[in-house]
Regions:
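N-terminal secretory signal peptides and thylakoid transit peptides that target proteins
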Residues: 1-14
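Intrinsic structural disorder/low-complexity segments
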Residues: 8, 21-22, 236
Length: 372
C-alpha cells in the first residue's frame, strides 16, 4: 500500500492504513453478488456483440492484451495532439456504432450514458465553432487547424483489453476529446474508474439548443455545498478566493500527484451539509452502472465517510466564475476545474482500485493458487 500520510500525524496514518487494509481485504474478498454478475455478463455480452460486428481488420486493431500499457494511456486532448489506440468510431459501420452504444449503455447508468454521448456530440459543435472562427480570424486561431479538424463525434476511439469471456478479466476504453472512460471486469465485478469528463461548450449559447448544458450538476452541486458552509467551516475548506486551478491535477498518469488531504473533513459538516456532499459524490460515482456504483460507494463508506475532505479554490458565488474543487478520501478523488468560461474538466478516481487493479491482483492470486 502507498505509504503517503496525507498530512496526518504518524499515529493517525498508521491507524488509517490499518483500516484501509481491512476495508480492501473485505472488498476484494467479498464474492460478486448475483446482481454484480448479471451486470458484468450484460457488459460482456454487449462487448462480444460489438466485436462480432467488426470486420477482421478492425477486430484486430481494437484488441490488446489486458496487461498492455495502452489501457492506462488515454487522453482528453484532441486526437491530433495525442494519437489514440484501437479503432476510430468514425471508421466503423453503422451497425458497429450501434453495438458500441449498446456496450456503453451496458457499462453506465442513464445519467452516465447521456453525459458521455452528449460530450461526443458537443465536440461537433466545438469543431464547427472553431472552424468558423479560424475562417474569419486566420492570423490568431484559438487552436491549430489540425487539432480543430480532429475534433468531432467521429474522432473518438475504442479499445478492448483481454477477451470478454466468462471467467476471464477484461477491460475496455473509450477516449477522445474531453473523454476518458475506462471499464474493467474482474471476478464478476465492474470498476468504472478513472473517468474523465469535460465539456466545451458547457452550455449551448446560440441556436435551437440554446441553454442546453452537458455537465450542469457537477458545478451547481459543488456551489451548493460551498455556499452552505458556515464562516468557520469556509475558513478551512476555501483555500483561496482567487481563480482556482485551471485543470484537474490527477489526469492520466498522475493518480498519485496528490500527496495529502486538504480542506474540510466530512465529519465537520452538519447533517444537511453531509447530504449535499453525498449528492455531489453521487453525481460522479453514479455515472457507472448501478452495481459498480453501489460497490464503489460501499467501499467509500467502509473506508470512512469522515475521511472525505472537501476543498475549494476561487469565487464562491458565481457558477460562471473560474473555480476549482476537490473531494479526496482513501477510496475517492473527485476534481472539478473551470478551464475558461464555458469550458470545464472533471475526473473521478479510486486511489485503491483504479482500472480494477486491486481486483485484478486478487484474480491472479486466486488463479495461481487454483493452478497449483
Amino acid at each position: 500500500m502507498n505509504r503517503r500520510h496525507f498530512g496526518l500525524s504518524a499515529t493517525a496514518a498508521v491507524l488509517l492504513a490499518q483500516q484501509l487494509r481491512q476495508a480492501l481485504a473485505q472488498d476484494a474478498g467479498r464474492p460478486a453478488s448475483s446482481v454484480d454478475r448479471d451486470s458484468a455478463w450484460r457488459m460482456r455480452d454487449a462487448a462480444t456483440a460489438f466485436l462480432e460486428s467488426l470486420d477482421a481488420a478492425a477486430r484486430k486493431a481494437v484488441s490488446f492484451p489486458l496487461e498492455a500499457d495502452q489501457r492506462t494511456s488515454w487522453s482528453n486532448l484532441p486526437v491530433a495532439l495525442v494519437p489514440r489506440v484501437g479503432v476510430n468510431v468514425g471508421a466503423i459501420g453503422l451497425q458497429s456504432r450501434r453495438r458500441l452504444h449498446d456496450l456503453l449503455r451496458a457499462s453506465t447508468s442513464s445519467q452516465g450514458y447521456h453525459k458521455i454521448a452528449e460530450i461526443m456530440r458537443h465536440d461537433d459543435l466545438l469543431r464547427t465553432e472553431e472552424l468558423e472562427y479560424l475562417q474569419h480570424n486566420p492570423p490568431r486561431p484559438r487552436a491549430g487547424r489540425n487539432a480543430i479538424e480532429s475534433m468531432g463525434s467521429a474522432n473518438y476511439w475504442v479499445a478492448m483489453f483481454g477477451e470478454p469471456v466468462r471467467g476471464k478479466p477484461w477491460a475496455w476504453l473509450l477516449t477522445g476529446h474531453h473523454l476518458g472512460a475506462t471499464f474493467t471486469c474482474a471476478g464478476g465485478r465492474v470498476a468504472a474508474a478513472p473517468l474523465f469528463l469535460g465539456a466545451q461548450p458547457l452550455e449551448d449559447l446560440t441556436g435551437p439548443y440554446a441553454g442546453f448544458t452537458v455537465l450542469s450538476h457537477e458545478g451547481l452541486r459543488g456551489l451548493d455545498l460551498v455556499s452552505s458552509l458556515h464562516p468557520e467551516q469556509a475558513r478551512v475548506a476555501v483555500l483561496s478566493t482567487e481563480p482556482g486551478f485551471s485543470d484537474v491535477l490527477t489526469g492520466v498518469g498522475r493518480r498519485d500527484s496528490l500527496s495529502r488531504f486538504e480542506g474540510l473533513p466530512a465529519g465537520d459538516l452538519d447533517p444537511p451539509q453531509q447530504r449535499l456532499l453525498h449528492a455531489l459524490v453521487d453525481e460522479y460515482v453514479r455515472n457507472a452502472d448501478f452495481d459498480a456504483a453501489e460497490r464503489h460507494l460501499d467501499a467509500i463508506q467502509r473506508a470512512g465517510l469522515d475521511q472525505l475532505h472537501f476543498s475549494w479554490r476561487g469565487p464562491t458565488n458565481d457558477i460562471r466564475s473560474p473555480f476549482y474543487y476537490r473531494i479526496h478520501g482513501p477510496r475517492l478523488i473527485i476534481e472539478f476545474a473551470v478551464q475558461e468560461p464555458n469550458h470545464i474538466h472533471t475526473i473521478m478516481r479510486d486511489p485503491q482500485n483504479d482500472y480494477g487493479m486491486d481486483w485484478l491482483g486478487l484474480h491472479y492470486e486466486e488463479h495461481a493458487w487454483s493452478a497449483r
